[in-house]
Amino acid sequence: MSKVTGKGLQRPARKKADYVRSVAQVIASANSLAPGPDFDWFAPNPEAKAAVHVKDGKYAPELSAASAFLGGVMEEGKASSVRVEAGDGKTGGVFVQGKGSWEVDGAWISLSGDCDGIGGPATGAVVCDGGELVIRDAVISASGLTHYATVAERGSVLKVYNSTLSSHGVPFANGEPQPNKPMQTPPPPLMIAGNSRTHCTMTNSESYFYNSTIVGDGWAALSTEAAEGYVLIEANDCTVVTVRRGYAAYVDPGCHVRLNRCKVDSADMSAIIGGEGEYTQVDCDVRCGANFLLMHSVFGEPEEVSEVTIRGGKVRSVGDSMLVKSRNIELLLENTDIKADTGVLIRSIHNEDFLATPVGEDPYGVSVTMKDMTAEGDIIHSDNEREMWLNLNNTTLKGAVCGAHVAFDSASHWFATSNSDVTLLGDVEVSQIDAPAGVTVTVHAGEKGSFALASGGVLELVD
């Protein structure tokens, strides 16, 4: 047995990030880039009304749009068998505003027409201003520009059980003209398309989904905005789909998105993580038409770190599994069956977006831990402003690794499928590294030397 001694390098310490985006800051940032007068895309139409308006836990018929209310039973704190249909973009389903809790037990809400803002009475179902809304056994469909099926905002809680939510936007897949105001379509760096999101949680609110289906035609199924402190989306045993384009979930700074035992079928990404937020996925079955995850940051602070945990489940993607663009991340992959058609497991690159968050001094970098798994795919680090730190813990990795600092525990092995270049941290037995004939594994270590590997490749140690 031959042991190789690694370099004694230390990963930079994580620094505290204090940046919290308010709605006003987000609006100002986007308007600074757009021509013409300032535009508040958060603001709903002031003329909008909901078929069922609830104020401080009480049904308010005088504030409701009776013409859109086709049927249902109103009780204390509850509406049952609600039927709503409207097509003017200004009339919504259920609007719960203020303190108190309201329950919808059975609903069929069908809305169409172009909408303004995020939330507001024209939404399929919305809770705001400190309220709680519980929805059971509902079908909510919203069609039209920026027409949301559900929204939770301004310190509220939404819980959805055994329901189907969908949004369709306006046509965009065949070259149709698209709106040009800020945030009526996704920012180009997201590499997606569409003009409506099915659900959004924002401004210190929480949303929980159970045994439900969330479908977006384009842009997004589950989205977050402007946390102003803390935002949470949690989906349990759900099906999350984007049909033509878009992501299943977005993590804005200060936001937390957790998918447990979900089936995700996304036209583009399963999730996009922007800035300092958390994305956790446990025992999910995921298929993506582009990348599995995109991690990036704009308008942010250099200290921001994205926290990503993928535990169990199965992930398949057409594009590189994980794309990291000028981003500090803390990524844990644990016991996950993950593969990409491109053969690339993780690719980190420099973000050419002029709005990309600056790098700062001693950046935390890209920290990846792979635990209790067998994985195939290349890991390629080409962001020259940050370093990658790869830890293998009871893991077998088959693929090239380039540009990373690598640490092994005694139960881990690496089979390099093509020429690789890494820096070794700690000590490793030569028998833990292998490569086929014709492949050279270059390791920057605490010593120099050359070893023939078991499958015919060569291990070159350089200082």
PLM regions and their residue ranges:
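N-terminal segments that cap or nucleate solenoid repeat domains
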Residues: 4-6, 22-113, 458-463
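Sequence termini and other peripheral, non-core segments
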Residues: 9, 238-239, 248
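Mature extracytoplasmic/periplasmic regions of secreted or cell-envelope proteins
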Residues: 9-16, 34-45, 53-61, 96-98, ...
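Long, compositionally biased, intrinsically disordered segments
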Residues: 39, 43, 54-55, 102-106, ...
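Extracellular beta-strand/beta-solenoid scaffold signature
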Residues: 50-52, 60-70, 88-95, 116-126, ...
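All-beta strand scaffolds that present successive hydrophobic residues in beta-strands
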Residues: 54, 59, 74-81, 101-106, ...
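Extracellular beta-helix/beta-solenoid repeat scaffolds
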Residues: 83-133, 137-142, 148-152, 158-162, ...
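Sequence/structural signature of small/polar-enriched beta-strand/turn repeats
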Residues: 150-153, 200-201, 295-298, 321-326, ...
